[in-house]
Amino acid sequence: RLRIASRLSAQRPADMPPLNILIEVNIDGEETKSGVAPSEVEAFADEIAGYPGLKLRGLMAIPAPAADSESRRRPLAAMRALFERLRVKHPGMDTLSMGMSADMDEAVSEGATMVRVGRAVFGPRDYSAKCAV
């Protein structure tokens, strides 16, 4: 991951402002998802902050699906706590992206500044063959 960040920074044209980035956190430790483990985020953020072509804006996560509000809230609260802890050292962080259509209420109440609400706006996706491009 740091190799990718290094390349993004190095290839950012000097006449452009730094590239805004979020660190993806694998908040639930799911094997099917990418992202930095919560225990490694602080060190990763410190490294990213040193790249002149990048601007660390915050964190993002997609928690595991959960059936009830309390189960949905737990990883979101953990993300908020991690975000607040990192902001002490990286005060330029202003974005906490978490929550989608199914958990946007809990995400917003836990401090999300950005949510992805595609299904709530556009309806469910149609994966049938008739929709193939």
For the regions a language model picked out, list residue spans one by one.
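Conserved alpha/beta-domain cores
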Residues: 1-102, 108-110, 122-124
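C-terminal helical cap(s) of enzyme catalytic domains, especially alpha/beta-barrels
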Residues: 105-133
